[in-house]
């Protein structure tokens, strides 16, 4: 029995040769047809290296690239492509394949889908295919509005005024949430759920820069 092709956003079967259902593409990218990512894995590695050396990469241990959406017309008549921009620009963050740790994008997106199933609020994310066929992990930036305007967000490394993002505790983060959150009880509950889920899924990367408070329109 032949396995059907799956949507890279929702994992349900596809009836076309595209990588996304139209509804899934509209939900994540804002277009009925998903934009193209016209880079090979070798080009991605070279871009990542150049950006890291230029000190304009998105912070983090795992290589990340900031992507902007360009609404132009492609050769096949479809509109839209994603292009690499500086760390301060773009509405998406891309994590390409890592030769040292194979299939990290697939693992991260699967974990995010599991979190959704458990009712945990997550940043919108998907897999996306490179021109050379490899899958990368892509997520929306939640510190940017659709028009590119910045949304104020601070991570716990900044909030707790720490000197080392790895030298702290979950208790210290919880106390900071209690002090600075405008919805303390709900945010503490969310934090507790994330801790339990991270323990179950083996996520041991819960350092201070992976927890943030974001200002919403009501604050």
PLM regions and their residue ranges:
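Regulatory N- and C-terminal appendages and interdomain linkers associated
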Residues: 1-45, 179
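Short hydrophobic/aromatic-rich motifs at helix boundaries and adjacent loops
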Residues: 35-39, 81-86, 182-183
């Amino acid at each position: 029995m032949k396995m059907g092709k799956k949507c890279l956003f929702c994992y349900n079967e596809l009836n076309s040769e595209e990588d996304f259902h139209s509804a899934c593409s509209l939900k994540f990218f804002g277009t009925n047809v998903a934009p193209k990512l016209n880079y090979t894995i070798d080009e991605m590695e070279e871009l990542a290296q150049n950006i890291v050396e230029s000190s304009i990469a998105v912070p983090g241990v795992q290589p990340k690239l900031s992507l902007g959406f360009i609404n132009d017309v492609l050769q096949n008549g479809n509109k839209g492509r994603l292009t690499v921009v500086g760390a301060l620009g773009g509405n998406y963050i891309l994590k390409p394949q890592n030769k040292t740790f194979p299939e990290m994008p697939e693992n991260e997106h699967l974990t995010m889908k599991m979190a959704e199933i458990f009712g945990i609020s997550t940043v919108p994310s998907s897999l996306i295919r490179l021109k050379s066929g490899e899958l990368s992990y892509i997520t929306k930036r939640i510190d940017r509005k659709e028009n590119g305007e910045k949304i104020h967000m601070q991570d716990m490394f900044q909030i707790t005024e720490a000197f080392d993002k790895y030298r702290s505790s979950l208790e210290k983060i919880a106390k900071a949430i209690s002090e600075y959150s405008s919805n303390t009880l709900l945010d503490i509950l969310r934090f507790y759920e994330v801790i339990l889920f991270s323990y179950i899924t083996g996520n041991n990367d819960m350092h201070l820069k992976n927890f943030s408070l974001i200002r919403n329109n009501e604050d």
